[in-house]
C-alpha cells in the first residue's frame, strides 16, 4: 500500500473537489462541462469505494488480532480478514494502474465488405446487426450515420455511432475496442445453388468518439464538402432534397459521409463527428508507435488471410485467433451475446499490459 499511498491521496482530494462541483447548480448550466465532471467522478468512484473498504477491513483485522491474542477462537476470523485485506489491496492496486484514456468514450464503428462479393456484403450486415443487438442489450443508443447497400440488402459499408447511457468508467469503447480487424465467415451463401461452404470476409474499424468536435483541431480550409441526393429514411426515396453530406479531409484523404439525418445541417454535424473521431485516432497513431501498430493491425486490407476471428456456420462455432478463444454458440453471438468473448479479450489485454509494466 505504501507504493499507492501518494496516488490514493491525490484521488481522494480530486474526489472531494468533484463532489463539490457536482453539487454546484451552476455546473449543470453547462451540460458539456457537467458531463465531463460526471464522467471523471464515475471513473474514480470505484477507487475511492475500494479504498474505504480496505481501510475498514484493516481496522477489523487489527481488532481481530487483539481479540485472538486472548481468545484462540478468533484465529479463523483473523485468517478470513487477512485474505480480505490482501484481495482488496490487490483490487486497489489494479484500479490505480493506468487505464486506456478512451475507455469511457462512445464510439464510431465502420463495417466494410471485402472479398466475397454479395456474400461479403451480407456478412457485413450480419456484423452490423450483431453490434446493434449487443448495444441494445446494454441500453446504449445506436445511430446509423450512413450505409451503402448491396443488391441483396447487405452492406458494402456502414457507419454506426454507439453511445453509452451515462457516465461510466467502462464505456462503449472499453467493450468494443477489440473489434477492429478482419472478420472471416464460413457458410453456404444464399447465392450458392450447390450447397457448398464458401469463405468470405468483412472488415471492422472502431474509433473512440471525442466528447466534442472542437476537441480535435480541424481547419475548415482542409475540407471539401459535397452534398448529394439522399434516399431518405428507410430508403423509400421520400427525401428529394440534396441533404446527404460527404466530407473529404484533403491532407489525409479521409472521406466520411452521412445521409440518414433529416437535414443537410444535421448530416454535416454527424459527418464532422465521425471525421473528428478518425482524425483523433490518426493523431494518436502518429504520436505512439505502439498505438500505430495496434491500429494498423485492425484492418490493412479486407483480406481473408488477415483475420482476427472466424464465424463458422456449419459448426455453429466462433473462434477468436488472437487469444485462442472458441465457443459453439455462434447463433447467440450473432444475436448480441458477446460479453463472454469481450471479457476474455479484456482479460488477455490486462495480462499483456501487466507483463509490459
UniProtKB/Swiss-Prot annotation:
<keyword id="KW-0963">Cytoplasm</keyword>
<dbReference type="InterPro" id="IPR045853">
    <property type="entry name" value="Pep_chain_release_fac_I_sf"/>
</dbReference>
<comment type="similarity">
    <text>Belongs to the prokaryotic/mitochondrial release factor family.</text>
</comment>
<keyword id="KW-0488">Methylation</keyword>
<dbReference type="Pfam" id="PF00472">
    <property type="entry name" value="RF-1"/>
</dbReference>
<keyword id="KW-0648">Protein biosynthesis</keyword>
<protein>
    <recommendedName>
        <fullName>Peptide chain release factor 1</fullName>
    </recommendedName>
</protein>
<dbReference type="GO" id="GO:0005737">
    <property type="term" value="C:cytoplasm"/>
</dbReference>
<dbReference type="InterPro" id="IPR000352">
    <property type="entry name" value="Pep_chain_release_fac_I"/>
</dbReference>
<dbReference type="InterPro" id="IPR005139">
    <property type="entry name" value="PCRF"/>
</dbReference>
<feature type="modified residue" description="N5-methylglutamine">
    <location>
        <position position="236"/>
    </location>
</feature>
<dbReference type="Pfam" id="PF03462">
    <property type="entry name" value="PCRF"/>
</dbReference>
<comment type="function">
    <text>Peptide chain release factor 1 directs the termination of translation in response to the peptide chain termination codons UAG and UAA.</text>
</comment>
<dbReference type="GO" id="GO:0016149">
    <property type="term" value="F:translation release factor activity, codon specific"/>
</dbReference>
<dbReference type="InterPro" id="IPR004373">
    <property type="entry name" value="RF-1"/>
</dbReference>
<dbReference type="InterPro" id="IPR050057">
    <property type="entry name" value="Prokaryotic/Mito_RF"/>
</dbReference>
Amino acid at each position: 500500500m505504501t507504493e499507492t499511498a501518494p496516488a490514493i491521496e491525490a484521488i481522494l482530494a480530486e474526489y472531494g473537489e468533484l463532489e463539490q462541483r457536482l453539487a454546484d447548480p451552476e455546473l449543470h448550466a453547462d451540460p458539456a462541462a457537467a458531463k465531463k465532471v460526471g464522467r471523471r467522478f464515475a471513473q474514480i468512484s470505484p477507487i475511492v469505494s475500494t479504498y474505504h473498504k480496505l481501510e475498514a477491513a484493516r481496522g477489523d483485522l487489527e481488532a481481530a488480532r487483539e481479540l485472538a491474542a486472548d481468545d484462540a477462537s478468533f484465529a479463523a476470523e483473523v485468517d478470513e480478514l487477512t485474505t480480505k485485506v490482501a484481495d482488496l489491496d490487490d483490487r486497489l492496486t489494479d484500479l490505480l494502474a493506468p487505464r486506456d484514456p478512451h475507455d469511457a468514450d462512445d464510439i464510431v464503428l465502420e463495417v466494410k465488405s471485402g472479398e466475397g462479393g454479395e456474400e461479403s456484403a451480407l456478412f457485413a450486415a450480419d456484423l452490423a446487426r450483431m453490434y446493434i443487438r449487443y448495444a441494445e442489450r446494454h441500453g446504449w443508443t445506436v445511430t446509423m450515420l450512413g450505409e451503402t447497400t448491396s443488391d441483396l440488402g447487405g452492406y458494402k459499408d456502414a457507419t454506426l455511432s454507439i453511445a453509452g447511457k451515462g457516465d461510466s468508467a467502462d464505456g462503449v469503447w472499453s467493450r468494443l475496442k477489440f473489434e477492429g480487424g478482419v472478420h472471416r465467415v464460413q457458410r453456404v451463401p444464399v447465392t450458392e445453388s450447390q450447397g457448398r461452404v464458401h469463405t468470405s470476409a468483412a472488415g471492422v474499424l472502431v474509433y473512440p468518439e471525442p466528447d466534442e468536435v472542437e476537441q480535435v483541431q480541424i481547419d475548415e480550409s482542409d475540407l471539401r464538402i459535397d452534398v448529394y441526393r439522399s434516399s431518405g429514411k428507410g430508403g423509400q426515396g421520400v427525401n428529394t432534397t440534396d441533404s446527404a453530406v460527404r466530407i473529404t479531409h484533403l491532407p489525409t484523404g479521409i472521406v466520411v459521409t452521412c445521409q440518414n439525418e433529416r437535414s443537410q445541417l444535421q448530416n454535416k454535424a454527424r459527418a464532422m463527428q465521425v471525421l473528428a473521431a478518425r482524425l483523433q485516432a490518426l493523431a494518436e497513431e502518429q504520436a505512439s508507435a505502439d498505438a500505430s501498430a495496434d491500429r494498423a493491425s485492425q484492418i490493412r486490407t479486407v483480406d481473408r488471410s488477415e483475420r482476427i476471428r472466424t464465424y463458422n456456420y456449419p459448426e455453429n462455432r466462433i473462434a477468436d485467433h488472437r487469444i485462442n478463444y472458441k465457443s459453439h454458440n455462434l447463433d447467440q453471438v450473432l444475436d448480441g451475446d458477446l460479453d463472454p468473448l469481450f471479457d476474455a479479450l479484456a482479460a488477455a489485454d490486462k495480462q499483456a499490459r501487466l507483463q509490459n509494466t
